[in-house]
Regions:
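Cytosolic catalytic domains that perform sulfur/thiol-centered chemistry
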Residues: 1-247
């Protein structure tokens, strides 16, 4: 299934679950009518953990609380230039849910906006979860996969400061850099052909890729781009530089 969906395709869906992904201190209050807010600083992370944006313990139950069942169309979007929707899309994959990302995000929507509605509950998921889509630090050290870092070139090189305190500069040894904004063109993901060329230039002939960033959020942007480019053996390093870069 194509992980992207257009506005025209979205309008043709019957009773989709719409999730507006958000991260930061000022979440939006309105979105596509019928949407629910998917707050990466709230329900869609585990604040009891010492790393930011850790996956909630009951991920399947979380999606069920938003009314998601095995046959429910799920569409994720954001109003943050595509930085956050892919994270919710990836979490859905981990939970066994085949969601899609609205190409162009909220900016591509030309209809009216409405206030978000609370999670309705009532979902039932029986599909098998896919926990292997997330990797911990020991797995990243041991599995020999190529790590693709989605942070800026300056943060990767250690010439720009980290936004979170207590982290040293630099990158995971042996990793390569693909800053996540480069996969977008005016808010839309670049074409599969453009993304294929981009990944060939960065990863060569490697197909086993683990994506990292600051806290596992924008790593999912490059994971989405790799999926569109035809890569399949993909994972996200959950702790990312927030864990690896601890001083």
């Amino acid at each position: 299934m194509n992980p992207l969906i257009s506005v025209a395709e979205l309008r043709s869906l019957s009773n989709p679950v719409l999730l507006c992904a958000s991260m930061g201190p000022n979440p939006p209050t309105r979105g596509i009518p019928g949407s629910h807010l998917a707050d990466l600083e709230g329900d869609f992370s585990d604040p009891s953990q010492d790393l930011p944006h850790t996956v909630p313990a009951d991920l399947r139950g979380l999606f069920e609380s938003y009314g998601v069942s095995d046959d429910t169309p799920v569409v994720v979007y954001d109003d943050q230039e595509g930085a956050t929707a892919p994270r919710v899309w990836w979490l859905a994959k981990v939970a066994g849910v085949d969601a899609r990302v609205l190409d162009g995000g909220l900016r591509a929507w030309t209809g009216q906006l409405a206030e978000f509605t609370p999670p309705p509950g009532g979902g039932t998921l029986t599909a098998s979860p896919r926990p292997g889509l997330l990797r911990d630090q020991e797995e990243v050290k041991a599995d020999g996969r190529l790590v693709v870092d989605a942070r800026s070139a300056g943060r990767f090189a250690g010439t720009e400061p980290e936004p979170r305190p207590g982290l040293r500069p630099g990158h995971i040894p042996g990793s390569v850099n693909l800053p996540y904004p480069q996969v977008y063109d005016n808010g839309h993901l670049k074409s599969p052909e453009q993304l294929q060329q981009m990944f060939r230039e960065v990863v060569g002939d490697r197909r086993d890729l683990t994506f990292s960033c600051g806290s596992g959020v924008t790593a999912c942007v490059t994971a989405l781009a790799a999926t569109v480019a035809g890569y399949e053996d993909l994972a996200v390093y959950e702790g990312s530089w927030s864990e690896w870069g601890r001083a």
